Regions:
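Conserved alpha/beta-hydrolase "acid-adjacent" motif
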Residues: 270-277
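Accessory cap/linker subdomain of secreted extracellular hydrolases
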Residues: 114-122, 127, 183-256
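Catalytic active-site module of serine/aspartate enzymes centered on a nucleophile-bearing elbow/loop
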Residues: 298-302, 306-332
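Short, surface-exposed "cap/lid" segments of acyl-processing enzymes
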Residues: 49-91, 103-108
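Alpha/beta-hydrolase active-site loop
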Residues: 112-152
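N-terminal cap/lid segment of alpha/beta-hydrolase-fold proteins
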Residues: 20-53
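Short beta-strand/loop motif that positions the catalytic acidic residue
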Residues: 257, 263-265
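Primarily recognizes the serine-hydrolase "nucleophile elbow" in alpha/beta-hydrolase
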Residues: 147-202
Length: 332
């Protein structure tokens, strides 16, 4: 096992559709994009009636797991974004891109655990595994951004790249490479890399020094990752190459940025101490282009914890988080 990020999905009740469902049925425009030889699904969320109105691009990099972007069951559809995009769509065209070789739309009855897509062998598709890599996502997304900014309905005056969880690492590296990016939103990330969240989560499970050496097991796992850092074998979970690449500390991308950066995180998330470290280090270095927004007492997806340290799903904070993003962007 390696670090498990719980995917939070909320159901929106919709009118029953016919047998053939398209992104338009769910309120999205779709663009089929070819990256190298790969067909890429791009979804655009725009304010109704403003589809052709010139606005900046808000490019959202989602977290891990090979999930279809649009998921539905007999009751309705699950939200594509973890937040309600309506407020952001007033000022932006919001874009999200599908995972490689994962269907765009799926009935949840056809999906595996955590709504993941599995093939006939019961595994994630091999073509997905071979592309589920940091640099693949970064390079692909930069090409998509270049393409979108050529469209008549996209303003190039501002380009916001945002990412949550795994997506924060992708977003931060995009911002470090592409001069087109004007603002970065870094949400729920670990500036010291994925492996540090894995170790932190396992350390929290330890109760004594003899029988619960979970952190030590993760450090042994990390040694295996480094030894086999080009391996794409996914029989035991994420390929070593994917874990290695996402464990390169994003702090080295972040601290070089001169554009406005917003860092959001829950203080009960495993990554919280490392975001605090980033903040301390930036203060020490006199960097003034960063804004930090900690959500006190909340976990990875901004849910508060109960007395027994379980997420309280009755209190949904994601819309507050996204509304603050909009407020921050208005000020920057």
């Amino acid at each position: 096992m390696k670090l498990i990020f719980t995917t939070i999905l909320f159901l929106t009740i919709l009118t029953t559709f016919g047998q053939t469902r398209t992104p338009k049925d769910f309120g999205f425009r779709q663009i089929d994009f070819l990256y190298k030889t790969d067909k890429v699904d791009i979804l655009i969320k725009s304010k109704k009636g403003d589809e052709n109105k010139k606005k900046p691009l808000f490019f959202f990099c989602q977290g891990s797991l090979p999930q279809p972007l649009i998921k539905y069951d007999e009751r309705g559809t699950y939200d594509v974004f973890p937040f309600n995009p309506d407020s952001l769509s007033i000022n932006y065209h919001i874009v999200i891109v599908g995972k490689p070789y994962i269907p765009l739309i799926a009935d949840t009855k056809t999906l595996g655990n955590n709504f993941t897509f599995i093939d006939s062998t019961g595994q994630f598709p091999k073509k997905y595994i071979a592309r589920n890599l940091l640099d693949y996502y970064v390079d692909r997304n930069i090409e998509i951004i270049k393409y979108l900014q050529k469209q008549t309905w996209i303003s190039s005056k501002q380009l916001v790249v945002a990412g949550h969880s795994e997506g924060s690492t992708i977003a931060s590296k995009i911002a470090s490479i592409s001069p087109l990016v004007t603002h970065l939103i870094y949400s729920g990330g670990n500036p010291m890399g994925r492996i540090m969240s894995i170790i932190q989560q396992s350390r929290a499970r330890e109760t004594d020094t003899d029988s619960t050496r979970f952190g030590e097991e993760e450090l042994s796992y990390w040694q295996d990752v480094v030894t086999n850092k080009t391996s794409l074998d996914a029989t035991q979970g994420d390929p070593y190459k994917s874990t290695f690449d996402f464990s390169i500390p994003p702090i080295q991308y972040l601290e070089k940025l001169k554009i406005p950066v917003l860092v959001c995180y829950g203080t009960k998330d495993w990554s919280s101490p490392f975001n605090d470290y980033l903040r301390v280090d930036l203060i020490r270095k006199g960097k003034s282009n960063f804004t930090f927004r900690p959500y006190i007492g909340t976990e990875h997806n901004y849910f508060p914890l109960t007395s027994d340290n379980r997420p309280n799903y009755e209190i949904f904070n994601w819309d507050k988080v996204a509304n603050y993003w909009l407020k921050w962007l208005d000020q920057k």
